[in-house]
Amino acid sequence: MSEQRGSGRGGRPEGGRPEGGRPEGGRPGGGDPRRGAGGQRRYSAQRPSERSRTTDPQRLAAYTVMRAVADGAYANLELPRVLREKRIHGRDAAFTTELLYGAIRLQGLYDPVIAQAAGRPLSQIDANVLDTLRLGAHQLLGMRVATHAAVDETVGLARKVNGAGAAGFVNAVMRRISEQSREDWLALVIPATAAPTARLAVEHSHPEWIVKAMRAALLGHHASSAETVDADLGALLASDNAPPRVSLVARPGLAEVSELVEAGAEPSALSRVGATLTGGDPGGIPAVREGRAAVQDEGSQLIALALARVPVEAQGSERWLDLCAGPGGKAGLLAGLAIEAGADLCANEVSPHRADLVRQTLRAAAALAEARGHRIDVRTADGRVIGEEEPGRYHRVLVDAPCTGLGALRRRPEARWRRTPADLADLGRLQRDLLASAIDATAPGGVVAYATCSPHLAETLFVVGDVTKKRGDVEAIDARDLIVDAEGSPVPHLGDGPSAQLWPHVHGTDGMFLALLRKRG
């Protein structure tokens, strides 16, 4: 939920409609949305409020990014660029971020609301106008924005980006939406006979196939019982719609957590190298700006830390491999941990562009490692062939496998609408090939860490099970023993083992999965 704002940009003033409230006489659906219950014409964008004023820059920025996302861009990459270009900072940047992310995340709820309020199917609403209405609906139903400000500003935005004719339509639909609370709209757009998963899909704005998959994942990873799974599923889906906290990592050898704390962050309770930023721009912290620290989810930190903690058998210096290193987040932490351990690290990435990003990330660590007589290298190769080309070379291997990202939906608002069940087949083949290659590349006594940012059973337990049952040269290690918090205590609620599954609604991290496999001698 975004913070309350002043009425000039949509805050709820004294006496305004409370969040989720409903004015007297409100009614959704039915008839021309531009006319009220006696046929009288409703408030129009063309009169009497057509004012000579500039469009709110925050809403215009959100709309600009939303249209870019519709064309295939990623919100988390596009938004920072637009904010910089439009010089939107501080509270205004926070408002823009919540408006954009919320409208994208919750379009599975807002779309049926818009269709009913408009009295027509979405296919008959221009895509550009629909995005404007999604932004408006989020202000009315998902943010602490005063009704008059939400309607006025959305109509003004429509007039600028969609045209005067569209502004009248947007005005009518917005006023119809404002007549009901979010709870009332849910009751109207979800049929009383809807199946539980269909109801949750609309209520929490997820495709129904994801709802079903997450229910199976909670049961399959033993995070829920038959008695608790429905409540746990609701909490998990709700966490996907909550803005995540900003987690930072101090890369060992290059920065200390204390430096991040001095810059305004709080020490992480989960990660010994982590911190949490409760406000402000991470890029304003010198260590982050200089690449000695970075934004990284605590779950990702725990994966790298677990691999570094597990005992291995090695003669002399250890050799570590990050098999799928791009764009470099985990590689940056692994590099620091390798420096701490006096080990060499090879970061492999199949994409040349992403390999360049990894080199940029590891530049400072590589220089420090070289000064201490060790190597941190970046190579560009297909991870599926490294096991054949370098059999038994590495002592610690991370397979941060490409996946659907269903455990990180809170950070990637558009991902839930782009992924389909068909993605699982192609990804599953790749995941199995990468894990098999990683095992081949591991020396006897070494360890492979297979990780995904998805709890989907087809990307986690099924992959590990299919690969390991075909070979007798690996044994599972209980990953739960290696995932410890900042004080060194075991992190609870990771499942029944030997793999470990983190959950957004339980641990506050992304939904990271980890399996640790030791190569037998």
List each model region and its residues.
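S-adenosylmethionine
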Residues: 1-521
